[in-house]
C-alpha cells in the first residue's frame, strides 16, 4: 500500500534522533538580538522614525539560520536546543552570517527547494530520505500470516488530517471577513502537486499587530522561496541603511527598522524578491515589503466548478482570490429567470448522468461478485485437492501448523444490495421521465412568484405611464383655458369703460365733473382746454 503524500512529507521533514543526544547549542546572546517591528500610519512617500519594542531583555536568546552555504564552514557538528537538532560551526568567510570566526547555528534541514551546495543540510536530507525509503521497503516486503481484513489503518489514512481541516477553516473565516458577499456554497480546492505559496501584501490601513512574542528562538533566513506575488502596488516597504531608492512608485508607505536583527509578529513576513523571511538582520540587497502568506488554494462557486470540470478550454486561475468569489452568485441573481432555467436544465442533466453512473456501478458490483464467486470455487477446489494430498498428515491446516480458514459466501447480501440499487435507479429514471426539464421549474415557482408582482407593476407603468401623463397634461391645459375664457369678458368691459371716458367728447348739457372714469386732477387740467372752444362757438 502506497503511503499518502502528506504523511510521507511530514515523515521526511522530521529529523531523526540518535540514542546519544548532541551537546546543547552555544549560539546564545546575553541580551535580546531582535526587536519586534511596529509603526504608525504614515503619509505616502514619508520615512518616519522607527517604532519598535525589545523582548526578553537580559535573557539569553537562541539564534539560528535556515540556510548556510557550504563555503562558509570547514566542519559542522550537531547540537541540541529545545529538543530540536541544529548544526553549529565557525564561519571561515567574512561575508557569511555572523562574520569571520564566529560560531553560528543553522537548521538541520534547509527549506524545500533550497540547496546548500552539498553541505551538511543536503547530506542530512539525503540520509533521512534513504532511511525512510528503507523502512517503507522493509514494511512492504515483510510477509505475515493472513489474519483477516483490517480496515482500521485505511480509515485513518482516509480520515481528513487535522492540520488540513484547520487550514480550510481559517481560510473560510478569512473569506467571510473580507468578502462583500457572504459565500455559503463554494468549493475550496488544494492542488495535489507542489505549488508555491501566494503572497498578499499587507494593506495600508492594517494595524492589528501583536505586541508580544512568546519564543526565545529566532530563525534568520528564508522560510519559503518561489512565492507567487498577487499585487505589486500600494506596498508597505522597508527602508534599510543601504536602501537608496526611496521613491519607488510601488511603495505607498515606508518603514524604517533598527540596524540589528529584528522580527515580525506571527502571521506576517518580509518578502524580498521571491523569498519570505520572519527575521532580517537589518540589510537586504533587494526591495522588501510586508506580506501575508496563504496556501495555493482556489475558490470555486458551483457554476465555476461545473465549467471547470466539463470539457471546455480551461483558463489559468489565480489561487485564493477569495475576495472576488461572489461573481457567479451575483451573475445568477442578475440574469433572473434565464439563469434559473439554465440551472434547472443543468441539474436535470446532472441527475440523468448520475442515474447512468449508478447503473454502471451496479453492473460493476455484479461483475465483481461473479469474479469472487468464481475465485471462491477455484479456491475450494484447490483446498479439497490439498486436503487429499495431505490426508496422511492430518490435512492442510495441521500440515502447515496454522489455524484453518474457511470461506463464508455472502454473495446473497451483495445481490440483495444490488437489487435495491437497481430498484432505486429505475424509480429515479421514471421520475425524471415524468418530470422532464421543464417540470423541475415548478419547484422554483415559490422563489419566482414574489418577483412577478413588482415586475408586472414596472411593465404596466412603462406601458401606460406616458398615456396617463398626457391625459393629466391635457386636463390641466383645458382647465387653464377655461379659466382664461371666464376672465376675458370682465377685462373687456373694464377696458371699454375706460376708453369711452377719454375718447368721446362731452355733451353740451353735461357738466365737466360728470365725466366718468377721469380723476379730479385730470378734470381740473381739462377745463382750460374747453373754454376757448366755448368762446369761439358763442
UniProtKB/Swiss-Prot annotation:
Region (Essential for the fusiogenic function): 465-484
Chain segments carrying region Fusion peptide: 320-340
Motif CX6CC positions after renumbering to this chain: 397-405
Region annotation Immunosuppression: where it falls in the sequence: 380-396
Positions of transmembrane segments: 444-464
One GO cellular component term noted in the UniProt record for this chain: plasma membrane
Signal peptide, first to last residue: 1-20
Post-translational modification: Specific enzymatic cleavages in vivo yield mature proteins. Envelope glycoproteins are synthesized as an inactive precursor that is heavily N-glycosylated and processed likely by furin in the Golgi to yield the mature SU and TM proteins. The cleavage site between SU and TM requires the minimal sequence [KR]-X-[KR]-R. The CXXC motif is highly conserved across a broad range of retroviral envelope proteins. It is thought to participate in the formation of a labile disulfide bond possibly with the CX6CC motif present in the transmembrane protein.
Residue positions of motif CXXC: 186-189
Further remark: Ortholog of the human HERV-W_7q21.2 envelope protein.
Subunit structure: The mature envelope protein (Env) consists of a trimer of SU-TM heterodimers attached probably by a labile interchain disulfide bond. Interacts with the C-type lectin CD209/DC-SIGN.
Record text about domains: The cytoplasmic region is essential for the fusiogenic function.
Official protein name in the record: Syncytin-1
Originating species: Hylobates pileatus
Amino acid at each position: 500500500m502506497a503511503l499518502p503524500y502528506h504523511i510521507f512529507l511530514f515523515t521526511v521533514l522530521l529529523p531523526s534522533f540518535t540514542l546519544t543526544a548532541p551537546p546543547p547549542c552555544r549560539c546564545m546572546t546575553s541580551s535580546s538580538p531582535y526587536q519586534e517591528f511596529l509603526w504608525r500610519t504614515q503619509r505616502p512617500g514619508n520615512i518616519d522614525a522607527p517604532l519598535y519594542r525589545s523582548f526578553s531583555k537580559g535573557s539569553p536568546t537562541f539564534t539560528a539560520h535556515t540556510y548556510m552555504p557550504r563555503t562558509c564552514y570547514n566542519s559542522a557538528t550537531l547540537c541540541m536546543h529545545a529538543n530540536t537538532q541544529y548544526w553549529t560551526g565557525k564561519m571561515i568567510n567574512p561575508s557569511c552570517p555572523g562574520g569571520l570566526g564566529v560560531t553560528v547555528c543553522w537548521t538541520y534541514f534547509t527549506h524545500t527547494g533550497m540547496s546548500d551546495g552539498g553541505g551538511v543540510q543536503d547530506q542530512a536530507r539525503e540520509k533521512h530520505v534513504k532511511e525512510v525509503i528503507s523502512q517503507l521497503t522493509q514494511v512492504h516486503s515483510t510477509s505475515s500470516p493472513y489474519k483477516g481484513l483490517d480496515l482500521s489503518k485505511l480509515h485513518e489514512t482516509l480520515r481528513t488530517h487535522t492540520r488540513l481541516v484547520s487550514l480550510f477553516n481559517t481560510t473560510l473565516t478569512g473569506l467571510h471577513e473580507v468578502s462583500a458577499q457572504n459565500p455559503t456554497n463554494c468549493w475550496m480546492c488544494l492542488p495535489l502537486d507542489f505549488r508555491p505559496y501566494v503572497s498578499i501584501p499587507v494593506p495600508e490601513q492594517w494595524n492589528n499587530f501583536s505586541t508580544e512574542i512568546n519564543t526565545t528562538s529566532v530563525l534568520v533566513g528564508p522560510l519559503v522561496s518561489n512565492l507567487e506575488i498577487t499585487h505589486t502596488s500600494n506596498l508597505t516597504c522597508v527602508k534599510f541603511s543601504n536602501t537608496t531608492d526611496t521613491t519607488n512608485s510601488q511603495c505607498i508607505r515606508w518603514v524604517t527598522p533598527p540596524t540589528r536583527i529584528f522580527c515580525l509578529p506571527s502571521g506576517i513576513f518580509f518578502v524580498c524578491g521571491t523569498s519570505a523571511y520572519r527575521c532580517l538582520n537589518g540589510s537586504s540587497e533587494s526591495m522588501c515589503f510586508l506580506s501575508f502568506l496563504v496556501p495555493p488554494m482556489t475558490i470555486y462557486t458551483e457554476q465555476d466548478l461545473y465549467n471547470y470540470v466539463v470539457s471546455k478550454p480551461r483558463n489559468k486561475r489565480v489561487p485564493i482570490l477569495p475576495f472576488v468569489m461572489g461573481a457567479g452568485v451575483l451573475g445568477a441573481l442578475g440574469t433572473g429567470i434565464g439563469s434559473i432555467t439554465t440551472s434547472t436544465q443543468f441539474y436535470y442533466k446532472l441527475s440523468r448522468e448520475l442515474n447512468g453512473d449508478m447503473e454502471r456501478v451496479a453492473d460493476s458490483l455484479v461483475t465483481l461478485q461473479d469474479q469472487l464467486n468464481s475465485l471462491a470455487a477455484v479456491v475450494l477446489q484447490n483446498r479439497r485437492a490439498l486436503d487429499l494430498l495431505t490426508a496422511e498428515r492430518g490435512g492442510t491446516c495441521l500440515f502447515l501448523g496454522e489455524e484453518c480458514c474457511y470461506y463464508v459466501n455472502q454473495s446473497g447480501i451483495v445481490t440483495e444490495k444490488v437489487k435495491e440499487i437497481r430498484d432505486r435507479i429505475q424509480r429515479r429514471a421514471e421520475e425524471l421521465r415524468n418530470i422532464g426539464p421543464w417540470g423541475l421549474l415548478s419547484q422554483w415557482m415559490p422563489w419566482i412568484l414574489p418577483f412577478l408582482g413588482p415586475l408586472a407593476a414596472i411593465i404596466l407603468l412603462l406601458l401606460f405611464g406616458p398615456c396617463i401623463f398626457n391625459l393629466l397634461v391635457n386636463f390641466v391645459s383645458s382647465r387653464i383655458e377655461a379659466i382664461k375664457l371666464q376672465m376675458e369678458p370682465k377685462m373687456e368691459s373694464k377696458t371699454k369703460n375706460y376708453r369711452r371716458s377719454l375718447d368721446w367728447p362731452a355733451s353740451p348739457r353735461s357738466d365737466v365733473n360728470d365725466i366718468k372714469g377721469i380723476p379730479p386732477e385730470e378734470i381740473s387740467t381739462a377745463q382750460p382746454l374747453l373754454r376757448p372752444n366755448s368762446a369761439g362757438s358763442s
